[in-house]
């Protein structure tokens, strides 16, 4: 399954409009923010059509899973589905299991998961974490996090922002690149996104820029923000581009009309059955685009 899909779901009182473009989308937020209402509208329309009193317009096949039924669990309900956007209601504990993560990876479906807790088994993007925002009768599904998020606001004067330390999750070509870019700062690799907090804590002084791949960072976002907020004696900025490979592909270093077309329409080229996250897609695309040229690149070095 690939591509971007849109939904318009409404009742007499509320209207939801949103699009889904990756294999994993997370909807979070407090109670009474519209999450259950959205899934209820989608479910009842799927079950009864216009007789439900609701209206749903979409260019996708979809399914809504609310809870286990007697004699039928989530595997019975979901395993046969193909090329479908599957919405899963909150409080279904199976979404935190390795078995479900394997199903997401292999099924070829898109998943919209309602949960307040991070899904640590799944590699989802910071750009696919949403909250439902209500403005009168119109309800929008808005992105919770953005590509660059400033952790602290206690350094309002830009010339005071002297970054002494750069920490990146990459230990290979990305690390080499950032070391050249930030040659006047201390450059450190955490050897993976799971070690970033530890590395930041070990660097006890100095303002810091932390660079990680946003395409698969979604489950870590909340815990990292909380960990960095308590470091109140210094400024910590967290930058999460899709991936290092993505930055190269978008830089116009590689002159290719085909590449430009792909980068302008990424959802149309990422087959979720083949690529667990966009990060995997960008890595393969960069290797493919540079395989025969002078800009030959590997995962371990430039």
Predicted regions and their residues:
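Conserved glycine(s) of the Walker
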Residues: 33-35
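Hydrophobic anchor at the beta1->P-loop junction of P-loop NTPases
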Residues: 27
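N-terminal pre-Walker A segment at the start of P-loop NTPase domains
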Residues: 1-16, 140-144
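Structural recognition of the conserved hydrophobic beta-strand(s) that form the central parallel beta-sheet
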Residues: 87-89, 108-118
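Conserved P-loop NTPase "ATPase switch" module shared by AAA+ and STAND
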Residues: 65-98
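Post-Walker A alpha-helix
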Residues: 38-40
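Acidic, divalent-metal-binding catalytic cores of TOPRIM
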Residues: 92-93, 127-302
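Post-Walker A helix-loop "phosphate-sensing" segment adjacent to the P-loop in P-loop NTPases
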Residues: 44-55
């Amino acid at each position: 399954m690939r591509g971007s899909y849109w939904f318009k779901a409404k009742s007499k009182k509320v209207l939801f409009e949103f699009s889904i473009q990756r294999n994993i989308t997370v909807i979070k937020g407090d109670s009474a923010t519209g999450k259950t209402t959205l899934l209820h509208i989608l479910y009842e329309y799927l079950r009864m059509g216009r007789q439900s009193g609701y209206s749903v317009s979409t260019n996708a096949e979809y399914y809504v899973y609310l809870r286990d039924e007697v004699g039928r669990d989530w595997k019975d309900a979901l395993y046969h589905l193909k090329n479908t956007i599957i919405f899963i209601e909150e409080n279904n504990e199976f979404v935190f299991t390795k078995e479900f993560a394997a199903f997401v990876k292999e099924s070829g479906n898109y998943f919209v998961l309602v949960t307040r807790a991070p899904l640590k088994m799944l590699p989802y993007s910071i750009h696919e974490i949403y909250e439902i925002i209500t403005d009168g009768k119109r309800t929008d599904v808005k992105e919770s996090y953005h590509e660059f998020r400033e952790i602290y606001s206690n350094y309002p004067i830009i010339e005071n922002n002297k970054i002494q330390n750069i920490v990146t999750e990459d230990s290979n070509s990305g690390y080499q690149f950032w070391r050249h870019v930030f040659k006047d700062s201390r450059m450190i690799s955490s050897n993976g996104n799971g070690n970033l907090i530890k590395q930041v804590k070990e660097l006890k002084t100095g303002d810091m820029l932390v660079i990680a791949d946003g395409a698969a960072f979604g489950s870590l976002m909340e815990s990292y923000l909380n960990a960095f907020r308590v470091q109140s004696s210094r400024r910590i900025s967290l930058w999460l581009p899709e991936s290092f490979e993505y930055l190269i592909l978008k830089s116009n270093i590689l002159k290719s009309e085909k590449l430009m077309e792909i980068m302008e329409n990424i959802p149309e080229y990422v087959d979720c059955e083949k690529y667990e996250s966009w990060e995997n897609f960008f890595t393969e695309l960069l290797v493919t685009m540079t395989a025969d040229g002078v800009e030959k690149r590997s995962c371990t070095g430039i």
